[in-house]
Amino acid sequence: MNKDNTLHVDTIMKITMFSEVSVGILANSILFFAHLCMLLGENKPKPIHLYIASLSLTQLMLLITMGLIAADMFISQGIWDSTSCQSLIYLHRLSRGFTLSAACLLNVFWMITLSSKKSRLTKFKHNSPHHISGAFLLLCVLYMCFSSHLILSIIATPNLTSDNFMYVTKSCSFLPMCYSRTSMFSTTIAVREAFFIGLMALSSGYLVAFLWRHRKQAQHLHSTGLSSKASPEQRATETILLLMSFFVVLYILENVVFYSRMKFKDGSTFYCVQIIVSHSYATVSSFVFIFTEKRMTKILRSVCTRIINI
């Protein structure tokens, strides 16, 4: 690839990455503060508002740290020291883990909420908010422990010349590790993500069954001439299933890009594509939640109307 093409590709990647970050930060900020207001303004706040607020907060942290990483990739002159590199990459990895945990537990909570009276999950209904909140805090602590090796694996490399280092930004790179350590950390990450993906798939299967039963009931009501309007539970279930499907597609695509990067030894283009793909869920999911929540759309419309009339 010649110099002009390389510059053109870098410009496209830069615009795409910063657009994704800025739009995602704005959307997640709106989502977080809206659900925070719902939590504080209701006499009996719904647990779903807490989980969506937690998800939007972790996604906000993820996108902010990604924005700082992107700034060091394209704008800065590689002036970070080792402490800055370690702190930022560690916080970014934690935010990614927290986001995965929050998305998974949101699926599990909704599965428990929609469980029938005959289901074994019914006994968890009343205590599920406490159990899931406790599980989220436990997972946060575990992520902090599992990601602690990053503090020793990342250094500042302003004048990177060795091929043994793995590029992260202009300032930061991963130290080369022995095969046993690499295998151990890779296995830990693979097991962790397989567990969460499996749990999300299980809960999604339950939600699909719920939608199927609801559709049969709607067809029966339609045949008898009664109203078959979609319930709030059905709309929320469809939203979560849509997000789950989108998450799985992005997860598969991210892994394809990652292995392509390793195979072709590409240090820039595939790496940028991988970053963009891996953070797309944090941006898109916030818009899905915003535009499927009637209360939020009404608030946004009223705000836009006031701005236009000023």
Curated annotation (Swiss-Prot):
PANTHER family: VOMERONASAL TYPE-1 RECEPTOR. The keyword Cell membrane applies. Disulfide bonds join C85-C172. GO terms for biological process: response to pheromone. This is Vomeronasal type-1 receptor 93. It comes from the Eukaryota. Keywords: Cell membrane, Disulfide bond, G-protein coupled receptor, Glycoprotein, Membrane, Pheromone response, Receptor, Transducer, Transmembrane, Transmembrane helix. The keyword Signal does not apply. GO terms for cellular component: plasma membrane. The gene is Vom1r93. The chain crosses the membrane at residues 21-41, 60-80, 94-114, 135-155, 194-214, 239-259, 270-290. Residues 1-20, 81-93, 156-193, 260-269 are extracellular.
